[in-house]
Amino acid sequence: YPSPKKAEERFIGYLLNTLRSGEIDVLFPVADACLKPIVDHEEEILRYTRIALPPRDIFTAGYDKGTTLRIAMENGIPCPRTFFPESPDDAAGIAEKIDYPAVVKPRVSSGRRGVRVCRDSQDLVQAYAASASEFGPVVIQEFIPYGGELGVYTLLNAQSEPRAVTVQRRIRSYPISGGASTLRETIKDERSREAVGIALRLLKAMRWSGVAMVEFRVDARDGSLKLMEVNPRFWGSLNLSILSGVDFPYLLYRMVMDGDIEPVPDYREGVQCRWLLPGDILWYLSAPKTWQNLKAFLR
């Protein structure tokens, strides 16, 4: 189909032509590039099918990292110290008072695109100019030293009540310095329960419905959880959630069709899933060549 990034109107036209058959019960947007065009044209699309996303005003709260962080700060959700520059002068002023390293992050982007770690004020001002030019509005944040990462994977009904939750921890990533996870594991412990409580409180404040992943980093300085972002769509490690006993796509389909579902009471812990090609192979090739790493990779 036409690229939603390079030819949005053609993409929407193609989509509407496909939906006019009346044979599609629910539209599931699963790629970042498709999300905003579909939300922007929701009135046209809703003539032919249902959309497995929250309404436009609520969707923006998860799609725009700046909006997410403002809601988090207003509701006492632990997150990095964050600034919202609106001009180069704002960025220069922030650069003089923030501690380093600091992070410049686009408010709307996928993965680590446009994210820059800055070592001094000159670096930050240059990073702001580059990111703002390519991606639009950005946030500037304190850097949180990496002590681990947890993801809370959720399905909420129209009243923002949880219907399914799983928690995963990141074991390996590529690049090692920070990137896509190559090995993850479902967990249940005191830290994961804390993360679930914080995530559900945030999503309630956002009035969220549908699926969302809430990402936390463990602050290596004190072991506390810090909100990194909310992913307003299905996540890359979705198969791990399904293998642990929670079929999020089917549950979301049933909820969109029926209005609500019974809560899923539990999931299996200790289930692992890895992205072997090329992710985990690249991790191994870039990791220190130790017996422990070889043994872990071959398990």
Predicted regions and their residues:
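Active-site nucleotide/adenylate-binding loops and adjacent lid/helix of ATP-dependent enzymes
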Residues: 59-146, 158-162, 190-197
